[in-house]
Amino acid sequence: MTASDHARGRPDAPGELRRAGGQLEPAAFADLLAGYCLDVEAGQTVLVRSTSLAEPLLLELQRAILERDAWPLLRVELPGQTRGYYDAARDRHLDDFPDLALHEVRRADAILGIQAPGDVRELAGVDPDRIARHARARRPIREATMKKRWCSTLWPTAALAEQASMSAEEFAAFVCSALFLDQPDPVRAWGGLAAFQERLIGRLSDASELRLEAEGTDLTLSVAKRTWVNSDGRRNMPSGEVFTGPHERSANGRVRFTVRSSPAGIDVDGVELQLRDGEVVAASATVGEAYLQRALATDDGARFLGEIGIGTNFGIARPTGTILFDEKIGGTVHLALGRSYPETGGKNRSALHWDLICDLRAGGRLTADGEVIQENGRFF
């Protein structure tokens, strides 16, 4: 296979999983999640969170988990439930959580989150301070989740298709391809991508300084002795990135993010940051600046970078407005404001983790200790 084939993880031999045949079949998707992503074993408890719009996938997940002699625990949210919570919640409901919520996570062996929104702008009218308070309060739940086998994925809905400017059928086919479920052997496909990314990590692991250059961007940061993670579909499905946590006080320069972001259903675009000794000292956005400023004020860690990631999935070629896909686009780099992933060696703690994307496909460059890693969206 060519380097591009490896980057897309495309296989050339058949396998044993049920194929989607170009259409997104819930049974094939569920088998991939229960088998490859979570590696569910007999006797384990799998906590699955989603909305009722993911019913076809949830029913097949129940089957796939039971077939592995494990216990499925489905937590299904109703349309409007999250907005209704923020509208009616009193202070204690924003600043605390029930003990059972943490107990479930601690007792689960694996945790699967499935995005399936009915309205991507459901929270657009909610005071961002209420959202931030709730996020801060639930930090122990997030930290407990990170210690488990966990995976985040997506089930296509009409709202997500509209956000991506696609028809429902087009978006479902797009998702199927991004998951490699249109391939004869999806697991082998993800293995091919993992191998490509492992070679990329081999080039990055000994690097001390990364430099990101593009129009409006010239940023340096240190990744010395930090651990690079090969995101091969086990934590995110789809995936296609390698990432690490930069040294918290090392980022210097400016960066312009060129892909629209939609956190909590709020459009944010044209974000520009100035960083000095790791901290954001100036920030602006052409759209959604009020949200940007509130996000940076979430807590002490929100003004520092928790992640740098390099997208490698050339099967995802266009932004969709959904970060699960967009941060994986081959030829892009993303930086996260806020929380680090502990496995990278990153030490930044925050209730915020907001990925922002810089597209390098039209004149950008990423170097490691002066060596070109990626230029104009191509790996070298």
Regions found by a protein language model. Name each.
Residues 215-216, 225, 275-277, 368-371:
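Short acidic-glycine loop/turn motifs at beta-strand connectors
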Residues 62-67, 227-228, 271-274, 297-300, ...:
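Short, solvent-exposed amphipathic alpha-helical segments in soluble enzyme
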Residues 282-347, 366:
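Dual-mode signal for accessory low-complexity, basic/Gly-rich regions
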Residues 249, 264-267, 274-275, 299-303, ...:
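A structural signal for short secondary-structure junctions
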Residues 238-283:
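Oxyanion-binding "anion nests"
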Residues 334-380:
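Intrinsically disordered terminal and processing segments
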